[in-house]
């Protein structure tokens, strides 16, 4: 577990979204954080084609190169000299690799020298079945690998029989949970099981009635009604 570090909640934030989700889905989150007093908040622009390319290492590198450029831009104007990272779904797993200085994909990013907090939202950290690159991250950089970084893992619990759940999540959630964690009966956000999203050693929050994304339910991690809850948890450390 990394040493606890004091993080300024107002320092700039960079958001990396989830697989096949484009930046506009996170624009309300960035705007809300700025209204709350965060110095600046940006979303990493990634097209759907670029997400499809993350099946391969060069696709990860392309996205993380963009993360690195934006982090350095935000760092230059940060009152603390540091940046907070938010990763949704697969983005949260990718950012764990970004924090490391090990040249796994032919380049070490040294992200932990610039970023002292990583918040993950419904990220499939621990899985019995995952893509090779996600497995590599959890094998090479298990848990809270970088000392001095405050890792916070947010999981959602979605009642599949409740009003929030979409018909899609009702049909597919149990199959997703079985695929990721080996058990169709687990609780989760409609895609990622709670036990997979709670990164080992991180600060944990299980958020009720929260879907993985807009496709899975009306209220998800990026909905303003949910944002305030997990952001309050993160910053009241």
List the model feature ranges, each with a label.
Residues 1-237:
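Lipid deacylating catalytic domains
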């Amino acid at each position: 577990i990394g040493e606890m570090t004091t993080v300024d909640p107002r320092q700039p934030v960079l958001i990396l979204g989830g697989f096949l989700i484009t930046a506009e889905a996170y624009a309300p989150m960035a705007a809300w954080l700025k209204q709350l007093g965060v110095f600046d908040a940006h979303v990493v622009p990634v097209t759907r084609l670029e997400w499809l390319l993350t099946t391969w290492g060069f696709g990860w590198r392309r996205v993380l190169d963009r993360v690195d450029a934006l982090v350095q831009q935000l760092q230059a104007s940060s009152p603390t000299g540091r940046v907070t990272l938010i990763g949704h779904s697969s983005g949260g797993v990718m950012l764990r690799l970004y924090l490391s200085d090990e040249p796994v994909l032919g380049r070490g990013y040294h992200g932990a020298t610039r970023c002292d907090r990583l918040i993950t939202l419904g990220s499939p950290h621990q899985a019995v079945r995952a893509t090779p690159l996600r497995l590599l991250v959890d094998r090479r950089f298990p848990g809270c690998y970088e000392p001095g970084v405050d890792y916070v893992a947010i999981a959602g619990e979605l009642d599949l029989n409740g009003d929030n759940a979409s018909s899609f999540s009702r049909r597919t959630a149990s199959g997703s949970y079985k695929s990721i964690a080996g058990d169709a009966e687990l609780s989760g956000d409609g895609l990622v099981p709670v036990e997979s999203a709670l990164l080992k050693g991180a600060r944990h929050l299980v958020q009720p009635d929260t879907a993985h994304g807009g496709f899975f339910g009306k209220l998800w991690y990026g909905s303003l009604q949910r944002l305030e809850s997990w952001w309050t948890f993160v910053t009241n450390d």
